[in-house]
Structures are given as structure tokens and as C-alpha cells.
Amino acid sequence: SFLTQLELEKIPMIDKAGLAILGNDNFLLESLNKKKGQSYIDDYVAWTISSSKCLGLKVINAGGSEVFKQGVQSFELDDIVPTYGVSSRQILKALNKANENLKIEHPLHVHCNNLGMPGNVKTALDTIDASEGRRMHLAHVQFYGYDDKGKRGFSSGSSELSEKINKNSNITVDIGQVLFKPTVTISSDILRQFNAKKHAKPNKWIISEVEDGGGGIVPYFYKENNFVNALQWVIGLELFLMIKNPYQVFLTTDHPNGAPFTSYPELLRLLMDLDFRNSQISKINKSAV
């Protein structure tokens, strides 16, 4: 974390900050397993934030990196982490309570389980319910806006997800819009990156498993004639346009996972210019519209 702060200091002009990542580390999981209590976890979170000098707290696929070591490929909110006997939901709720108890200004920043998987909109909806009214920020929700209907088993769940967000003022989100171009996906969600490596373009990738987490770097090319990519593009725009409160939704491409941040002008035009948006819709895979 010290080296990270030194590197951030070298970046000029823009505001920058870090989020400390917990949710797959032995200390937390063991504390939950041994029922150490919420105040014990609060102290651990406080020490982590203070030591790392971070702005807030993030959880990435709570328990997912740990179950990856057991050969698991998907992990639901109520699935149990082997060895520790705690569920992803328990991890999430404990960290969210700590974030609230410590009055950390940034809400718990959540990378939900089952990113990129058909039907994962249910996971996102369950995660919102797990907040129990506490503040929570869901990251790159476009990647959780997927239902599993239709003959291809992949469809838009944006209507259901946006409706849920509209009804829960404690929730904020950023979109993680996909745009059609080559990019590189970088994530600490090792389950997702391991599953995605077969789609690497070019076919070079890195997967790293470490004691308290993991992740990977996988290059990818989003193409407008690809059904899945086109539907991802549509779902992101639908979420932008159907979430009613602009203070609940943040404009992002989840740089660089959906697209590089240099694509923001294109994204802004897509949202603000109906004629341009319609012209771009006419170019994508027709099955996705």
C-alpha cells in the first residue's frame, strides 16, 4: 500500500484515491468463523483503512478467491466458503456493518458475485437486499444486468435491475459501459478472469492466485456484430437511461474493462444524442436489439 501511495503521488492534476480490499483474507474469514463479533471486525477494518491510507473499503466476489482454490467456478451469495463455514452474504454484511459503524464516508464498494454470467441479475438483486437499507455502491453493474431468457440463454435484465435501484435510495452504482473496441480486462475477481481466459484476444493472459485474493489480466475485443457484446452495450445504455435519480448512477466504462476512459466523449454522445444512438443501434447485431 505504501508503494501504491507513492505511485499515486506521481500522477498529476487529477484526484486519486485507493480502496482497501477485504473479503477473501484469512483474518476476516477466520474472525467470522470463530464468531469474534462485529466490534472485532470493526477494529480490523479501521486498522486496514488507517494502515493503507485508503478512501474506503471494497469487497470483490466475497469469498470467491478462497473457493477458487477448491476448484469452484461460480459462487452464489448464500454459498459457503469451505474450511471457514461462512457464506458470501455473511462476509458482505459484516463489512457493510463495519463501514457504517466506522462512519466511513464512501459506502462499501461492492464487486458482486458471478460477474459476466447469464442470470446474474438475480445475484445483483440479492446483493441489494443484503444491504438491509445501509449505504452500498455496486460497481460496473452492466456486468450484472444479465438474465438467462431466450433461445441463447442470455438476455437483458436491465429493467428489473434499474427498477430495484430506483426503489432503494441507499444504493449507488456505476455502469461499466462496454464500447466496441479492443481493450484489456484487469480484475481481482479470479473466478471471472479464469473463466474469461478462453476468450482472450490475442490469446495471451495472466492469472495470479495469492494468499488473500487473486486476479488476472485478459485482453479482449468487443465487437458490434457479436451477439453477446452487442447486448452488453445495450444493457449498459438501458441502465443509464432507466435509473431515474442521476445522483445514484455514475458514468464509467470500468476502465479499461468495458472500454478505455478515452472513450468517454463517445459514451456521452450516445446518452445525450438520440439520433446518434439510433444510428449506432442500426449497426449492431440485430438479435441483440
Say what each PLM segment does.
Residues S1-I11:
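Metal-associated gating/positioning segment near the N- to mid-region
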Residues K16, L22, L57, H111, ...:
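Divalent metal-coordination and catalytic microenvironments
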Residues K36-N61, S65-V249:
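Histidine/acidic residue-rich metal-binding segments in metalloenzymes
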Residues A17-D42, T83:
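Active-site mouth loops of central-metabolism enzymes
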Residues S1, L22, I60:
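Conserved residues at the C-terminal ends of beta-strands
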Residues F27-L32, P182-K197, E266-A288:
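Internal, charge-rich low-complexity segments
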Residues L3-Q5, E30-S31, K122-T127, E266:
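A short acidic, amphipathic alpha-helical/loop segment
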Residues S1, C112, M242-V249, H255-V289:
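Active-site microenvironment of metallo-dependent hydrolases
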